[in-house]
Each structure stands twice: as structure tokens, then as C-alpha cells.
Swiss-Prot record:
The keyword RNA-binding applies. One of its GO terms (molecular function) is large ribosomal subunit rRNA binding. It comes from Oenococcus oeni (strain ATCC BAA-331 / PSU-1). This is Large ribosomal subunit protein uL14. Belongs to the universal ribosomal protein uL14 family. The gene is rplN. GO terms for cellular component: cytosolic large ribosomal subunit. One of its GO terms (biological process) is translation. Part of the 50S ribosomal subunit. Forms a cluster with proteins L3 and L19. In the 70S ribosome, L14 and L19 interact and together make contacts with the 16S rRNA in bridges B5 and B8. Binds to 23S rRNA. Forms part of two intersubunit bridges in the 70S ribosome. Keywords: Ribonucleoprotein, Ribosomal protein, RNA-binding, rRNA-binding. Pfam families: Ribosomal_L14.
Length: 122
């Protein structure tokens, strides 16, 4: 579960390395975000020459969480880190590559471009 002030690793080549959650989108008073949810975040660490800079306010979608997610078939999937992909307003990723596996729940939330760029979908 990702909440306000949570720090996440960025799993794409947009230039950001770490982001800090400002707000969880999707209703007033919503406190937590899981895999496939959109957040508003600020860039805390960035590489030189990247598309996004340190201090930029961006939207991102959660692709991996340590807390994991329950599936309908009874299985449960967890990851070793919390990670997100920076996206534009039309849900397309800013970067051109995705690093690491992503969860299958992104397909249900119509993030097909992220799923197609990912090296592995779990």
C-alpha cells in the first residue's frame, strides 16, 4: 500500500530515479494506492539529461508493491520493492523502456502500453 509521503523507485527511463507521493488519485479522502492506481508525485532524484527533472510534479502509476495484491483465483503476489512508472495525462508512459516485471492488474486498468513495454508480466 502506497500512501502520502511514500517514496518509490521509478521503473522507466524517463530520467527520474526516485519519486515521493503527494496525493493518491481516485476519490476524496482516499488514503492508499495499490498496483494499477494513479498517484501525483514529485521527483526527488533524477539523472542529468533526463526528460523529467528534480522537483517536477508528475503523475505515475504503481507497478510493484511490497504489500502485494490478492487475485481472484486465490493467488497472492508480492514484489521486493515499491515502483512506479511516470505517465502523461492520457496514460501513456513518458519513458520508452520499462525495467523489471509488472503485475497483470495493469492490463485490467487499460495500461496496455506499459504492459507491452515491460520485459515480464506476472
Amino acid at each position: 500500500m502506497i500512501q502520502q509521503e511514500s517514496r518509490l523507485k521509478v521503473a522507466d527511463n524517463s530520467g527520474a530515479r526516485e519519486i515521493l507521493t503527494i496525493k493518491v488519485l481516485g476519490g476524496s479522502g482516499r488514503k492508499f494506492a495499490n498496483i494499477g492506481d494513479m498517484i501525483v508525485a514529485t521527483v526527488k532524484q533524477a539523472i542529468p539529461g533526463g526528460t523529467v527533472k528534480k522537483g517536477d510534479v508528475v503523475k505515475a502509476v504503481i507497478v510493484r508493491t511490497v504489500s502485494g495484491v490478492h487475485r481472484i483465483d486465490g493467488s497472492y503476489i508480492k514484489f521486493d520493492e515499491n515502483a512506479a512508472v511516470i505517465v502523461r495525462d492520457d496514460k501513456s508512459p513518458v519513458g520508452t523502456r520499462i525495467f523489471g516485471p509488472v503485475a497483470r492488474e495493469l492490463r485490467d486498468n487499460n495500461y496496455m502500453r506499459i504492459v507491452s513495454l515491460a520485459p515480464e508480466v506476472l
